[in-house]
């Protein structure tokens, strides 16, 4: 799979969506913005389910320009799509090392657990240990581990993420990591800095795609400014967590 195309459906009132369709490629980051209740979660749910005009929005999702038969959608969705929600917790009673080794074995990969863990620890301020129980991981640690797992072990080319800025991880490194591993990443966000990371953003309103916006040169410059503020905030957070006074 190299591309996903989302074709328009209808908004909450039944009015046709005012866009012509959008095609997203592997290695691309696309952000999704809009007020609470505007339809952001429904949009990524349509992508996750490879909707075929049978969801409440009546959108259709194509893979490489081809419609997916109904009998294949569930199996393809589980193979192609990884979804990182806001609240992640493991239910498996195992250590981090056991989980990563088991997942690598299931995927037919030879990537050692220590390599995945090293990647996870690049994006979380609270390091994860191989011997640590999955049930003891914080939400941020769990997300960092799963992002590294998706990048190195998981073959799913589509990654859906809800509000990565609330995960307590380095979002710039995390999203860059997924893109470098040729994932198509869709991120639901309320944060201007995150929204401007992508070349294109989808604006939701009233349950519909209200617009697909290309990032302007002015917004690209603003993104760099917001990035400086983001990194300064990270420095302040690290100082506060060490018990330091802010100067």
Over which residues does each language-model region extend?
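Walker A (P-loop) phosphate-binding loop of P-loop NTPases
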Residues: 34-40
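H-loop/switch region of ABC-family ATPase nucleotide-binding domains
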Residues: 187-190
């Amino acid at each position: 799979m190299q591309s996903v195309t989302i074709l328009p459906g209808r908004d909450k009132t039944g009015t046709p969506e005012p866009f012509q369709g959008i095609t997203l490629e592997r290695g691309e980051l696309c952000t999704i913005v809009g007020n609470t209740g505007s339809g952001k979660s429904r949009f990524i749910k349509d992508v996750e389910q490879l909707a075929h005009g049978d969801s409440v929005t009546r959108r259709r999702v194509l893979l490489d320009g081809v419609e997916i038969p109904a009998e294949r959608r569930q199996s393809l969705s589980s193979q192609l799509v990884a979804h990182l929600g806001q609240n992640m917790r493991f239910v498996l009673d195992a250590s981090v090392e056991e989980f990563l080794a088991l997942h690598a074995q299931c995927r037919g990969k030879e990537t050692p657990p220590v390599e995945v863990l090293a990647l996870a620890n690049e994006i979380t301020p609270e390091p994860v240990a191989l011997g640590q129980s999955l049930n003891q991981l914080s939400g941020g640690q769990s997300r960092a581990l799963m992002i590294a797992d998706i990048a190195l072990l998981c073959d799913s080319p589509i990654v859906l993420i809800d509000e990565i800025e609330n995960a307590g991880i380095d979002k710039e490194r995390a999203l860059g990591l997924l893109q470098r591993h040729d994932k198509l990443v869709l991120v639901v966000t309320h944060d201007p800095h995150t929204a401007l990371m992508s070349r294109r953003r989808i604006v939701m309103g009233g349950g519909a795609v209200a617009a697909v916006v290309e990032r302007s040169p002015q917004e690209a410059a603003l993104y760099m400014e917001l990035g400086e503020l983001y990194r300064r905030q990270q420095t302040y957070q690290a100082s506060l967590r060490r018990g330091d006074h802010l100067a």
